């Protein structure tokens, strides 16, 4: 039996579109074992109990690369990461599948090979990298090779996820983005991405509200999320450090000072006045990333 734990992730972090991401302490667990024959799923809806399941697709990709053919598989899932909410559920499935397959096959692939394969399956590194490595990462793909650097985040900051009861697919969220951007908007985001990394690294938390601004994706996607701007405004009134759309949304992620004890209950009271139901969940940065059989990958 192979046990793999993968954290949720929040990508983009405001201006860092498709390159910044952070792992948080919300997890999916995967329990995988080879059996005599067949493919058995436990812990997921019936519609996902087939060969199109993303976990199995990722596992098969890994097995094919290694040249390993399992006789059969039992895959059990314990999921705490909500699907289609902008918290890296698909990245968690891909990473969990690839890591568990590699472990079943005797650990033939090294960490870099696993990471490159996961990005190949998922399509982009902003969620995959922090899910794999933990912490906050800045990532790019260069000729199909994943290049990344860990971002050191000063102590004293925490996150609060505002998770709605409605979903938003990544495909739909990408469809509203423009085909091209103005040069000045690119400069706007480049500067704020640099500021975000520096502010988090140096503990200049008062600068985060400026660094969260973006002109590439958030305003386009906000129209798909009812009450986004009123929620953002209320978060700012409650002395948040910064507010941004988590991944493609619809989850709204809030940065707070560690000592802030009142934000969660106050924003919850505000959210209860809205039509949709919102879950308020305080989170910390997960520093381990993916863990297999109680050891870091």
UniProtKB/Swiss-Prot annotation:
Binding site for ATP: 82-92
Keyword Oxidoreductase: no
Domain of life: Bacteria
InterPro entries reported for this sequence: GHMP_kinase_C_dom, GHMP_kinase_C_sf, GHMP_kinase_N_dom, GHMP_knse_ATP-bd_CS, Homoserine_kinase, Ribosomal_Su5_D2-typ_SF, Ribsml_uS5_D2-typ_fold_subgr
PROSITE patterns in alphabetical order: GHMP_KINASES_ATP
Example of a GO biological process term: threonine biosynthetic process
Catalytic activity annotation: L-homoserine + ATP = O-phospho-L-homoserine + ADP + H(+)
Keywords (A to Z) from UniProt: Amino-acid biosynthesis, ATP-binding, Cytoplasm, Kinase, Nucleotide-binding, Threonine biosynthesis, Transferase
Pathway: Amino-acid biosynthesis; L-threonine biosynthesis; L-threonine from L-aspartate: step 4/5
GO CC terms of this entry: cytoplasm
E.C. no: 2.7.1.39
Compartment(s): Cytoplasm
GO molecular function: ATP binding; homoserine kinase activity
Main location group: cytoplasm
Function field: Catalyzes the ATP-dependent phosphorylation of L-homoserine to L-homoserine phosphate.
Stored HAMAP family: Homoser_kinase (MF_00384)
Family as reported in the entry's similarity comment: Belongs to the GHMP kinase family. Homoserine kinase subfamily.
Protein name: Homoserine kinase
High-level lineage: Bacteria, Bacillati, Bacillota, Clostridia, Eubacteriales
